[in-house]
Amino acid sequence: MSDPVRLDIEDGVATLTLNRPDNRNALSPEMSGAIIDAIDEVEASDEARCLVVTGDEGTFCAGGDVSSMVELMSGTAELHEAVEGIQHETSRAIRRIAEFHLPTIAKVDGVAYGAGANLAIAADITLGSENARISFGFRQVGLAIDTGTSYLLPRQVGVSKAKELVFTGEMLGPAEAEDLGLFNHVFEDDFEAEFEEFIEPIANGPTVALRTSKQSIDQGFNASLKEAMDNEATAQAVVFATDDHEEGATAFMEGREPDFKGE
C-alpha cells in the first residue's frame, strides 16, 4: 500500500499531498500521523519556503474517517476513549498546519468536508478549483463540531454565519466559498497554472520577513494596538539583519527586481 502522504520539496515549495483517494483522503489516525511526520520533515528542511497542502485524485479531504471510528467503537476501548483517540491525532494534524511557521496554502480540488474543511481553512491561504466544495457538515453523521471548528470558522465568516453553516451542513460551491472568505481565490480556467503563478512570489519571497509577518498578524488578534506595534518593532529588528533585506533595499535603489534567497 502506498504511503498515506506524499511529500515533495521543489523550488522552495513543500507540497504535502494526502494520498488515500480510495478513502477520499479521510483523516484516519494513520493519515493524521503521516501529516504530522511530513510537517516535521518540512520543519527540518533548509529548502522549504512555504507549505502547500492538497489531496490526490480530485478529493481534498472527506474529514474524519468514519470507518476507523466505527471500528474503534466496536472494540474493547470505552467509547469516549475511542473518540478522543481519533480526534486527538486529527486535531494535532490540523494544529500543526495552523501553527506552522512558514506560509501555508491549501490547494482544494474536490471536496473538503467536516474536519477536512478545517484542514483547508487552517492554512494561511485557501485556493479552490472550479470543482472545489466545502462543508462543515458534522450534523450529517449526527455529530457536533470538533477539530477546531469553533475557533477557525467564526474567524473566517463571523459567528452568525458559522452557526448557519454548522446547523445546515450546507455544501458550498467555489463561488459561495470565495464570497464568504473561506476561499481566497477560485481559479476556474487552468487551476494548476494559476495556482503556480499565485504561489511563486511566496515561494521566492523574503522568507524570514514573510514568516515573521505571519507571526505578527497571528499575535495581533489578541493584542492591543500598542502591543502589536511593540511586537512588530521587536520582530523587525531581527528581519533588518537578514540578507534578503539587504538585497531588497539594494534592488530598490538600483531599480530592479530583488533576488531573494530566503535568508
Stretch-by-stretch model annotation:
Residues M1-D56, D244:
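Conserved CoA-thioester-binding segment of acyl-CoA-metabolizing enzymes
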Residues L16, R20, A34-I35, V53, ...:
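Terminal peptide-recognition signature
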Residues E30, A34, E89, R96, ...:
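Charged catalytic carboxylate motif
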Residues G55-R96:
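Glycine- (often His-adjacent) and acidic-residue-rich active-site loop
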Residues A98-L210, A241-T242:
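Crotonase-fold acyl-CoA enzyme core
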